[in-house]
Amino acid sequence: MERRRVVITGLGAVTPLGLTVADTWQAVRQGRCGIGPITQFDPADQKVKLAAEVKGFVPENYLPKPEAKRMGRFTQFAVVAAKEAMADAAFTLAEGEEDRCGVIVSSGIGGLSITEAEHDKGAEKGWDRVSPFYIPTAICNMAAGQIAIHTGFRGMCSCPVTACTGGTNAVGDAFHYIRDGYADVMLCGGTESAVTPLAIGGFTSMKALSQATDPNRASIPFDAERSGFVLGEGAAILLLEELEHAKRRGAKIYAEFVGYGATCDAYHMTAPRADGSGGAKAMAIAIADAGIQPADVDYINAHGTSTHLNDAGETAAVKSVFGPHAYELAISSTKSMTGHMLGAAGAVEAVISAMTLHDGFIPATINYAVPDPECDLDVVPNTGREKDVHYALSNSLGFGGHNGSILLKKWEA
């Protein structure tokens, strides 16, 4: 089978750092922290008071009010990000092309806030008062469905629900789908809006969340004092395109998509294998998929959640794949800025990795203060770097043992 080349020609994002890719990337370059007090509900009776919320998002600024009302917040984020990606790519669907264009967008939890509100309504007023729009607005796949409706893309439309790896699985699956000839264009990514009492309570009970009260010491990947992740929200959508298709229409190109690997730990519901072997295999598969050597990789956007098990295990995985080169490459976690956006995380980090290659700038791991001997690689502490990057790897590791890695290459015409 012919392996076609795939490039990234459009980017869209709604994140705790900004409502566009440009604003988000500027914040990343500045090392700005998007974490703050929870405002979407009163967290007085919660142990966790901080989250990485999207600020200033008014859906009616982007969507007709009747449409916006029939979408969950996670779907609104995704549709807005998709619109930005389409505009950024200057892509207009040509007649007869609909079946060669598809959508893959992940969400880990979907419309949880809608479920909470409709449950309360039903319990208080009777279950026949539950909204007929509850199910179609809350289900995880509706973000992908609404993007297809808004764009007219009639090829494959799907929603990987693989927890924190979902965004990476979505973009990786889309890459393979184009590479192997099943589509020419794919909108792909992830979205999440789970800053709710139930989600915060559930993750807190698992001891997964940081209970820090200082936003600058809450999400601290690879730091010896890390104590859990900070829940984030938002979306990112990438427009992937077969290279010749992009060239024919004179599209600008951010980066080339060259590798994808996915594995499963098959070990535990929430904990990764301590040796990081599942994540290591995903990285190795992505590198082999691209046909390069580990020493060719300059930068890794780590999963880096700020939990003890993840960061130590991911460090071990990187060492096992890269050997001595692990100490020569840069590995940073932008979750130090965005928090952990669950099903959107891998997609946002794919956008950041594409911008890293395009702009020649490696993001920092901000708020890093106390080195951990278990995480002794170059984590780009506190200050990003201007550097020409040729290959960037982005990792995601999710509950259920899901591991995913994507490999992007600097575009050289």
Predicted regions located by residue number:
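ACP-dependent fatty acid/polyketide chain-elongation machinery
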Residues: 1-67, 244-256, 351-365, 409-413
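Condensing-enzyme catalytic core mediating Claisen C-C bond formation in acyl metabolism
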Residues: 5-9, 32-36, 214-290, 299, ...
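Conserved beta-ketoacyl condensing-enzyme motif
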Residues: 8, 21, 29-162, 191-200, ...
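Conserved small-residue
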Residues: 10, 28, 82, 103, ...
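Acyl-CoA/ACP chain-elongation machinery
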Residues: 39, 182-206, 210-227, 260-274, ...
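Active-site-proximal alpha-helical scaffold in enzymes
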Residues: 78-91, 140-143, 148-192, 230-251, ...
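Phosphate/pyrophosphate-binding loops at sites that engage ATP/ADP/AMP, CoA/4′-phosphopantetheine
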Residues: 85-97, 245-250, 283-299, 321-325
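Glycine-/small-residue-rich "gating" segment that lines the acyl/pantetheine channel
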Residues: 124-131, 169-172, 176, 192-248, ...
